[in-house]
Amino acid sequence: MSETIVAVATAHGIGGISIVRLSGENALSLSDILINKNRKKNKTQNSVSSSQNRIQNFKKINLKPRYATLCELYDNDGNFMDESVVIYYKSPNSFTGEDIVEFQIHGGFTLENLIMDELITNGARIAMPGEFSKRAFLNDKMDLSKAEAIQSIILSRSKSAAKILARNLHGELKNFVIDLRKEIVKTMAFVETCIDYADDDLPNDILDKIQNLLSENITKIDEITQISASRRGLLEGFKVAIIGKPNVGKSSILNSLLKFSRAIVSDEAGTTRDRIEENLQIGSHLIRIIDTAGIRKSENSVENIGISYSIKAANEADIILAVFDASREFDKEDEKIFEILQNQKDKKIIKILNKIDLALKFKAGNSDNFLKISAKNDTKIITKVLNDYLNSQNFDGIMLSSNRQIMAFSNAGKALKRAQNLLNENSLELFAFELNIAIKEIASIYKPFERDEILESMFSNFCLGK
């Protein structure tokens, strides 16, 4: 990690301010080259000397750690580039644990590129994606759970997600994992006692204690894994599928919710043959709303593919909007929609009776359970019901924020369940082996056991400058 790295830490583009970030042992010296007021006098010397000589030839400027200093920036030919607020973070009290210098410059591609080019010419290297965070991890400035929380917060698209992820950033997930690991280690200690003193008299209830500890830990792992999977909508957007038979107004509802015309609306049944997906912000939540092909029996092979996609969308959705036509009598196609809903009892289902501005002919069960709307006139009630439902959900507590974390917990749970079966068979050595797998998987949430492979995979998904 001796190389000094540089990247733009803010979003690229035109804006008020851009931040160029340097990290490494030569960060301060490289900054001095840009800031030195005598650059014009040293123009000839600078143009012929190597980057390492330039670093050595300039004295370190008097940047006070954690203070903002207004400086002028010059290129290697002594030409003025920009005024910058420069902040120096002295090692080890910085994000990466190394010397960091940040240049707050005027925003825009041109200035960013000018400053970056000068720093690279003088010896810095462009940072790889996530390299600043990777250095922070390697220098023990953060653990993996915190690094993933930072990345998830950056990518989060709802206030609810940001609030939960802030808890992970604050260390709640790591503390939970440490406590869980201690419980599994405690179970391991009991097992090793049984193995080491197999010929001695042991308490009669020791196997019961092991079994109870094992069951408790399996329950904890299963709960957090299931809760985290059900809350993926907080990070990715809650999937809302609009389903119904053809020509009930599904596309009209989509267009009305989006407040622009996204789907083709026609009196001809079967107009929508492929799923249409759009993002929609409702309150503090991101919604991924999906319009689907009308579900019916069809001889058209292309339409049947669309219908299969509709059923798949319902299966994958967090919330289903089931739409029926108030102006048409209840028929076998509507009955088919009810059959699909019967298999989705674990989801929020909102039944909608559309076209209430026309003569009412639809009759099916308790119509009080339907939202009665006219998509042509107003769909605000749908937005309100969705917002009220999501606001009523309990999103408190710990959440696994990445697929890597969910996989680690899932693998740990599987290992403990295998261990449970081995305990019943009195295979204590194999039982201990499975416990070791679980311990490693749980600990990998904040400290991986396959270090290089996991770090490379994880940090490569981070943005540049982070």
Curated annotation (Swiss-Prot):
Exhibits a very high intrinsic GTPase hydrolysis rate. Involved in the addition of a carboxymethylaminomethyl (cmnm) group at the wobble position (U34) of certain tRNAs, forming tRNA-cmnm(5)s(2)U34. (6S)-5-formyl-5,6,7,8-tetrahydrofolate binds at residues 21, 102, 141, 466. This is tRNA modification GTPase MnmE. The gene is mnmE. Binds 1 potassium ion per subunit. NCBIfam families: mnmE_trmE_thdF (TIGR00450), small_GTP (TIGR00231). Homodimer. Heterotetramer of two MnmE and two MnmG subunits. PANTHER family: TRNA MODIFICATION GTPASE GTPBP3, TRNA MODIFICATION GTPASE GTPBP3, MITOCHONDRIAL. InterPro entries: G_TrmE, GTP-bd, GTP-bd_TrmE_N, GTPase_MnmE, MnmE_dom2, MnmE_helical, P-loop_NTPase, Small_GTP-bd. The keyword Cytoplasm applies. Belongs to the TRAFAC class TrmE-Era-EngA-EngB-Septin-like GTPase superfamily. TrmE GTPase family. GO terms for molecular function: GTP binding; GTPase activity; metal ion binding. Residues 237-391 form the TrmE-type G domain. The keyword tRNA processing applies. It holds the Pfam family MnmE_helical. Mg(2+) binds at residues 251, 272. It is found in: Cytoplasm. SUPFAM superfamilies: P-loop containing nucleoside triphosphate hydrolases. GO terms for cellular component: cytosol. GO terms for biological process: tRNA methylation; tRNA wobble uridine modification. Its cofactor is K(+). It comes from Campylobacter hominis (strain ATCC BAA-381 / DSM 21671 / CCUG 45161 / LMG 19568 / NCTC 13146 / CH001A). The lineage of its organism: Bacteria, Pseudomonadati, Campylobacterota, Epsilonproteobacteria, Campylobacterales.
